[in-house]
Regions:
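ABC transporter nucleotide-binding domains
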Residues: 2-4, 9-204, 208-210
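Non-catalytic surface loops within mature trypsin-like serine protease
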Residues: 26, 122, 231-233, 264-266, ...
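Residues at or immediately flanking beta-strands
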Residues: 57, 127, 226, 252, ...
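Short beta->alpha junction loops/turns
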Residues: 65, 104, 232-234, 265, ...
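A generic structural signal for secondary-structure junctions
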Residues: 77, 103, 119, 140, ...
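ABC transporter nucleotide-binding domain
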Residues: 170-263
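C-terminal coupling/interaction segments
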Residues: 264-315
Length: 315
């Protein structure tokens, strides 16, 4: 759906994007991440055709972006971080204006259908300048869907929204993906990206340093796993014996529970259950704590790690 090949962008002496090759597959939600200054915005602007790359190729729908630029644009919907709306227009007038630009047939039915989808039909005759930030973001989504795009490119789609607004936008993204649309999404709210993305790509210092599923990122980055134990009849001597187990790296007592860090070479929960039983403890709960996307992101960017397809970790 989107593929870049050795993409580079230089500004005089600054190389903002270096040899970038990413692949977004049809039908997936792809989370595009990176710290400030990593090159994400520059990359998105090149994919949208706003910036021309210094070198490299951009393929969208298996076509070179510049070989059929306007044909490709007609198949793409874009939602930016800030909606630059015509605030002296009503929502209906604004969407009708874009329907005319896109040559949308049955525009009245299309506008009403999409406004119902985002629960703004009853506000269709209100001026956009009177809309809240969340409502304006929804109108941005509606505008992006008017031309029935195959690909949605979302740049910080939930930035500045309250929890309700974030949930509504998340549900909208998932619904559109289930309808068959591919989604390429940049966001700083990592919990949202983790919740809905099939794969993520992480940029750092202008380069792509990771591109994989969360499950595979965990496998590549985790040298240890955290297991939370809640247990009764567990005295100081039992704690010492737990710490001395060959597969245990450390034990921390936290809010009446034990956070046990073990090696990541196998699932040691069964061994811990057997240990607690053998010493006469009463196990109330055992839970494995998975590495979050935030954990992976911080590990990769702060330690300047690059992950390769072989699973090799390079610092």
């Amino acid at each position: 759906m989107i593929r870049t090949e050795n993409l580079c962008k230089k500004y005089e002496k600054v190389e903002a994007v270096k040899d970038l090759s990413i692949s977004v597959e049809p039908g997936e939600i792809y989370g595009f991440l990176g710290p400030n200054g990593a090159g994400k915005t520059t990359t998105i602007m090149m994919i949208l055709g706003i910036l021309k790359p210094t070198s490299g190729k951009i393929l969208v729908f298996n076509k070179d972006l510049y070989s059929d630029y306007f044909g490709i644009k007609r198949r793409v919907g874009v939602v930016s971080e800030v909606q630059y709306l015509y605030e002296d227009m009503t929502a209906y007038e604004y969407l009708s204006f874009f329907c005319d630009i896109y040559n949308v047939k049955n525009k009245k039915e299309k506008i009403e259908e999409l406004l119902h989808k985002v629960d703004l039909y009853d506000r269709k005759d209100d001026l956009l300048g009177h809309y809240s930030r969340g409502m304006q973001q929804k109108i941005g989504f509606v505008r992006a869907l008017l031309n029935d795009p195959e690909l949605l490119i979302l740049d910080e789609p939930v930035s500045g929204l309250d929890p309700t607004g974030i949930r509504e936008v998340r549900d909208l993204i998932l619904e559109e993906n289930q309808r068959g649309r591919t989604v390429f999404m940049s966001s700083h709210i990592l919990s949202e990206v983790e919740r809905i993305s099939h794969r993520v790509g992480i940029m750092n210092k202008g380069r792509l340093v990771a591109e994989d599923t969360m499950e595979n990122l965990r496998k590549k980055l985790s040298s240890e796993v955290e297991i939370e134990l809640e247990v009764d009849n567990f005295d100081v001597e039992a704690e010492k014996r737990l710490e001395s187990l060959s597969f245990v790296n450390s034990v921390i007592k936290e809010d009446g529970k034990y956070l046990v860090r073990v090696k990541a070479d196998k699932d040691y929960r069964g061994d811990l259950v057997n240990f607690v039983s053998a010493i006469g403890g009463n196990l109330k709960e055992i839970r494995k704590r998975e590495m979050s996307l935030e954990d992976a992101f911080i590990t990769i960017t702060e330690k300047n790690i690059s992950l390769f397809s072989s699973g090799e970790v390079s610092e």
